Amino acid sequence: MAMNLPPLAGSGGAHTQPSLPALPAHLQSDTHLTAHLASRFHLSLPTAQLSSHALISLNTYTSSSKGPDGGKEGSAMAGAEEMAERAWLRLGHRSENQAVVFLGESGSGKSTLRSHLLASLLNKSSTPLSTKVSLAAYVFDTLTTTKTATTPTASKAGLFYELQYDTASTTNPVLIGGKLLDHRLERSRIADVPTGERNFHVLYYLLAGTSPAEKAHLGLEDSAVQQRRWKYLGHPTQLKVGINDAEGFQVFKNALKKLEFPRSEIAEICQILASVLHIGQLEFESSANTQVTGDDSGGFSHEGATVVTAAKNKDVLAIIAAFLGVNAQDLQNTLSYKTKMIHKERVTVMLDPNGARSHANELARTIYSLLVTYIIESINQRLCAADDAVANTISIIDFPGFEQQASTKSALDQLLNNSATEALYNLTLQNFFDRKADMLENEEVSVAATSYFDNSDAVRGLLKPGNGLLSILDDQSRRHRTDIQFLESMRKRFEGKNPAITAGSSTAKLPGSNFLTENSAPIFTVKHFAGEVDYQVKGLTEENGEVISGDLLNMINSTKSEFVARLFGQDALQTVTHPKERSTVMQATISSKPMRTPSVMSRKTARTARNQRVLQQKAAEEELEKLSENNSQAGGAAKAAASEQGASGQFLAALDNVTKAVADPSTNSYFVFCLKPNDRRIASQFDSKCVRTQVQTFGIAEISQRLRSADFSLFLPFGEFLGLADAETILMGSERERVEMVVEDKRWPSNEVRIGSTGVFVSERCWMEIAHLSEASLAHGRFGLPSDGGDGLTPHGASPADPFAASKERLLSTGNTPLMYGEKGKNGYFGANDGSDSRSEAGVSAFGGGDMFKNFDTREQMAERGNEKSLVEVEEYRDSASRKRWLFMVYLLTWFIPDFLIRFIGRMPRKDVRMAWREKLAINLIIWLSCLLAAFFIVVFPMLICPRQHVYSAAELSAYDGSSGSPGAYVSIRGYVFDLEKFAPRHYPPNLVSTEDILEYAGKDATSLFPVQVSALCQGRAGSIDPAVLIDYRSTNVTGSPTLISQQDINANFHDFRYFTNDTRKDWYFQQMAMLRANYLKGRIGYSPKYMKTLARNSRTIVSMNGRVFDLTEYVVGGRRTVGEDGKDISGVAEDSYDFMEPDVVTLFRQLSGADATRHWASLNLSEQAKTRMLTCLNNLFYVGDVDTRSSVRCKFAEYLVLAISIMLVTIIAFKFFAALQFGTKNMPENLDKFIMCQIPAYTEDEDSLRRAIDSAARMHYDDKRKLLVVICDGMIVGQGNDRSTPRIVLDILGVSETVDPEPLSFESLGEGLKQHNMGKVYSGLYEVQGHIVPFLVVVKVGKPSEVSRPGNRGKRDSQMVIMRFLNRVHYNLAMSPLELEMYHQIRNIIGVNPTFYEFMFQIDADTVVAPDSATRMVSAFLDDTRLIAVCGETALTNAKSSFITMIQVYEYWISHNLTKAFESLFGSVTCLPGCFSMYRIRAAETGKPLFVSREIVEAYATIRVDTLHMKNLLHLGEDRYLTTLLLKFHNKYKTKYIFRAHAWTIAPDSWAVFMSQRRRWINSTVHNLIELIPMAQLCGFCCFSMRFIVFVDLLSTVLQPVTMAYIVYLIVMVIRSPDVVPVTAFILIAAVFGLQAIIFILRRKWEMIGWMVLYILAIPVFSFGLPLYSFWYMDDFNWGNTRVVAGEKGKKIIVTDEGKFDPASIPRKKWEEYQGEIWEAQTVRDDARSEVSGFSYATKGHPGVQVGVSEYGGYSRPGSIAGGFSGAHAMPPLPMNTSRMSLAASEMGGNRASQFGGSQYFSPEDMVGLPSDDALLAEIREILRTADLMTVTKKGIKQELERRFGVPLDAKRAYINSATEALLSGQL
């Protein structure tokens, strides 16, 4: 049949033809079609059609609603509406499911056309639900769209939007629901915003649209914003790109309200969005965590602090914690650590700042993704109809456009996005080329083949289930394979098999190298339909896992926010629980597929005419129901499998749902090809090359060619066709013939109709024509139901201007331009239908206006609620009497501080913390008071005894003569000393006497220059004196030094204003003296009592009263005269004026000359008025100075008191010096045969430190067979800078294969609540290093399955307790925990030494290196003195020169050992044995009595309740010192010593923060431990020679260190001020201290110590002043944990904790004999177990043919590390899963062991024939042991010797031989 195409429409030319297939054949090439599109584009006709199947739309970047005439006709909007009309008609008239698939690059306008299509479809519905469905789409776009370089509204999540209809009753479908299915949100964008792009719009909306009050609540204040850049929002310019974010936020909130979200939930959503923004603001830094906890572990380098990552901006952290409802500290800890699964082991990685930043990004991505999922699921719950009510659906499919380059750094997002685009394009090709091929063939209709680009290879390669690329990626990720392994797997799968996928090389040659190395940037290439794309392999498998750390989830489990709990309780969060602890979440992933699947495509109809379609739809329904069940069934195997799927697997499953739903036979699909006219987003510019590339990419020319030959959209059976055609009038012929007549009559083109054998294939146009649904009906919407407001989503009279996708588009505009999915008027999102849906207002009425947080809790209240803990009671106790007394004293000292001030100002809500603060304050007050008393005693007390006198003797005054070298220029006037040097420049008048002349009087008595008017200064006996009376003055200085100035001095006349002169000024002298005393007084002339007596003997009348000295000599000898006004002597002056002094006073002075007359003055028979007058006269006329008491006895006592203190201190130092003088030859000790354990606790040290410590211990010159390395790994932690966990590092060093994986066993630990239950793994074997082969035992604390963060970590003290408790139970024969039984087994049966044989415990830290002879020297000391219980050696620094901080510590370390510890060692009581280098006696040599592991010590050291300040300082600050205290306390008959010849080297803190924290620990620990020691009466010695006295001195010196520094400063000041002999002597004594120290290191030839001593002296202010004050004040700086004490009834105290209550019965315990008995009953002892007497076993070496020893616990023991050895796993059959464990019930202990270890065989009675009897065997065994070397004999060797002697195989007797050997060796037989 000839193809008759319709003529070109109109007469306007080819460009008026909208349908591309209608163009002539010669115009069907890519170039011609592009030209055709260009011609239409330039006429404002941006659309074209591919028949009725597809719409081609070009983005004009201006308006999507403007046609050529300015109206809607011809616009993209009109094209979308026409397609909506077609879908609507097909849905209503044929009850078919409809699907509209959008294809196009980013920026091509897909989102805009989608919104037009959706608006048009919703406009057809009369149901009020349509508004909500529209709003749901807006909410989805707000959450998932962003601005990119190509478009301001780029979709970043795949959308499958399903509109649900009931089509049963009418041809007008009824909208009954909607379903949003989101596919793979681009989560990587949250924390990685590409340059020039934005994050998701909602975050900007929140920032711009909230009110000031809301911003304040959310922490988004403008003032704060101006000072910071929001890291998650990209460059600040992205906040101002023409998008109306504020308006968008209001629309978003209103949309949520209309969708019935409660007001509180909308507010919570905003809080979560704000928390996402704040997470981006978090800044991290590496800091030293100086806050002490019980979990601290490690060596000296860890003692001061643990290097952790902390948040810089705590305020931001607090906001996030408040909104998430968690504790801020917990949040910081969670972000600083990350728990991972590495090789089936759960480890916690200590993150550096970059790692913490990544972890915070993970939290932000998780929160945002869950929020989006929650909102979408909540919308679906409100909109989605029940499946059985849905007849048909219209589905809108819009996935993000193809990406040539990843916009974010996520290769996974790019791969999945492009895979989806590939699948949708393949779906398009199938629809046009292959969909009806089978039906055409069955109907015997032939269609000419059309060539086209088939992307099936790429689709199969990417999406094929099982072995497609995404499936391979998912499989490799699930199996924890590396990226290179994934690349190799992909190569094996696709190389030579699929041309679309090419795997790159995994190796590469570095420049300048000829050797292949691993490729650092491997790629694989996929040939997509849109071009080749290279994908980075690096990090792809890890990213595909999308693992959310269990730390985050466990933190969220404690949230107090119900909303956050709901977010994390969604099914979208797929958790992985521990197989043995289902309540423990190990990790989780967020689903990359929707929570729901497409609805079942069914139609409720009973029309018999459509039975065939009904059957087809039922088949489709069954298929999709199976698909739905497989993806949604809860709790079954399918869900378990899904939970193991990674992102690619989940996305693949979801994409498969989409493609099957669209490709279903009952679904009619439409396609929208969106094209960009140019790449630069320039309006009205058509780039032919750009468009032609897109036309070629989508194969539009091939599709058009196909439609020219076969444009079939429907298949109508003959009967249905004839019914539609009203062909009843044609009565003749068969149905086929009648159909042919109708077709011929219609004259349809051959490409639109074909007649088959049973029906007719027709195009949609033909169907509409025959169904009387004319094309005109599409334009007028005749078959739709118009709303009362027009289209329902467009305002009345709105301008048709509809921005397409430019910066003015919809919500991006600020004026009257339309919003995003509807106009800004009342009929936009909130159109005319709003009022008809009462449900949509349910959430609105409650919302109100203004601040959405108005009735919300404040951030502070949220934070307080987040800090609350759920507590349970764990213990009840009463305070001791001493504790009560102490608390009474505390309150007595701190009563003035009210409790509420500590609570609110100090922010200490917990009572126990407040009490500790009070205790700290009380202790500080006591210390400060002690310091003040010491300072008072040293400084003030001497001054009280001898107050400082400002007096100068005559000789001293003469020294101040102003000459060069003199201290100054002083002059005396009537007993007062003045500063002449200061006065001379101010002499008045200045020109009369020169300054040089004035200074000539320096050092002299200038009294003669100042004549006095007697009557003005003295009232005499009568109350007045005649002014003519004069009195002479003569110096009392009989030696003549200072010289008395003559009265005839040339300058004397200038000061003479007496009565007889022309210029009389009677008060001039008094005034001048007052002025001089006020301004220039330096002191007084001093007369010692001795000098006064000398003067008296020289006929001087000189007396002292009240410390003042008066000289009446001139008065007594008559040195008075009277001079009148004319200057001549006169007579007749009254006697009482001439003899103006009372005779009694004169007599008193004569009689007491040279003595003190104070007491006699009081008894004078004179009136008080007379005494007052006489005293005035004495002070003004006869005063010559003060009594000089500086040489008195009390003043000498005060001076020598300082000297006495110095002598006492130096005496103690001298004793220490003599104690340190230990000389002798350095002899090498002999070889010793004592068994020692060397314990090394490991925490987060690096491999180098651990290797140095382990190797140094292994290489010690001590018999390798008699030392055991015991390494305790404190938790599964990866330290900063490490690539493996610490246990893995240790095991790698020791040579333990990763295949060796013993099962964890329970044991008791030191912790709060349930943390007392811990689990550990035990490894053992031989370690070979530099010729040494040393047995080792490794205990790895792995924690219970419920522990997520830092599993197993309990601290260094707990690590010590693992061994101490084990040995305690061994020696006391107590029941042991499963871990201890395993340790016993490994030591006794694998290593071959009975644990009781070990006599000494050698403890070193993991950062300590010991000298080769250290253990030998220590053991020698123990052997020399059986009363020695513990020793320590000298510890030096390995990092001495790394910083100034370490340099100042070198000398201090050396001197603290060689002076302090050596001195204490004299008394046998070293009070601090450092845990980094000490050895302890485990049991007494003679009696075997436990010492170091005695019951008292173990119980005291294992104290768990550490809730007081004192106990925390003892057990958390200095556990090593406290352990020493316990040894001295409970074993007071034994001694502790310092061995100066044993050496070790450790690492010291090299930063101030860590150094200060370490010293805070040491100082406070010292104080509290010494307080523990002082009450002990057992300390050796007597009186001051006792250690108790030295302990007291040590305590006092520790407390008074600040005063020591102040004392030194005081001495310096004294020397500067008065360099006399006393303070100089004190300095000499102090210098002697360092001199003695210098003698020690000089005698020991430690010359380098000279330099270190200088640095130490410079740092004395730090050591003696700064550190003690800092330490004392921060004595309570602990992490107090969650255990606290509350008041109970009747004075009892109740301990509560949030860690739960520990039940000791949860850890089963058995004695070793019981356990071994059960083992022996079930199996025979293995061949290669050695006698414990031999002390050494080679069973673990794993030589060929030798079975490796295996733990009776079911786990393999560690095979030896000897080269050529083999793993025990290969020597043994695999253990069954039901192997008995000690962690099970006690009744299960020892069960199921008969054949699980390969050790025993079963023999029939026939096997026993001909064998020797047991008695014969016993006799021979006894004979063999009598002559054999017990150090080399083995049980296997005994069996072989017996077989040789008896000549028969003795396998059947193996059990008896082994048990008999054991019994003989142990003495039981």
Curated annotation (Swiss-Prot):
SMART domains: Cyt-b5, MYSc. This is Chitin synthase 6. GO terms for biological process: chitin biosynthetic process; fungal-type cell wall organization. It is an enzyme of class 2 (transferase). Residues 655-679 are annotated as: Actin-binding. The gene is CHS6. In the N-terminal section; belongs to the TRAFAC class myosin-kinesin ATPase superfamily. Myosin family. In the C-terminal section; belongs to the chitin synthase family. Class V subfamily. GO terms for molecular function: actin binding; ATP binding; chitin synthase activity; cytoskeletal motor activity. ATP binds at G104, E105, S106, G107, S108, G109, K110, S111. It holds the Pfam family Cyt-b5. Residues 629-640 have a biased composition (Low complexity). It is a multi-pass membrane protein. The keyword Transmembrane helix applies. Its EC number is 2.4.1.16. Residues 1-23, 593-612, 620-640 are annotated as: Disordered. InterPro entries: Chitin_synth, Cyt_B5-like_heme/steroid-bd, Cyt_B5-like_heme/steroid_sf, DEK_C, Kinesin_motor_dom_sf, Myosin_head_motor_dom-like, MYSc_Myo17, Nucleotide-diphossugar_trans. The chain crosses the membrane at residues 886-906, 925-945, 1201-1221, 1596-1616, 1622-1642, 1649-1669. Disruption phenotype: Leads to a winkled surface morphology. Impairs penetration in host plants and exhibits a significant reduced pathogenicity in Arabidopsis and cotton plants. Residues 1811-1866 form the DEK-C domain. It catalyses: [(1->4)-N-acetyl-beta-D-glucosaminyl](n) + UDP-N-acetyl-alpha-D-glucosamine = [(1->4)-N-acetyl-beta-D-glucosaminyl](n+1) + UDP + H(+). Glycans are attached at N123, N417, N426, N557, N630, N657, N1037, N1062, N1165, N1458, N1564, N1778. It is found in: Cell membrane. It comes from Verticillium dahliae (strain VdLs.17 / ATCC MYA-4575 / FGSC 10137) (Verticillium wilt). Gene3D superfamilies: 1.10.10.820, 1.20.58.530, Cytochrome b5-like heme/steroid binding domain, Homeodomain-like, Kinesin motor domain, Myosin VI head, motor domain, U50 subdomain, Spore Coat Polysaccharide Biosynthesis Protein SpsA, Chain A. One of its GO terms (cellular component) is plasma membrane.
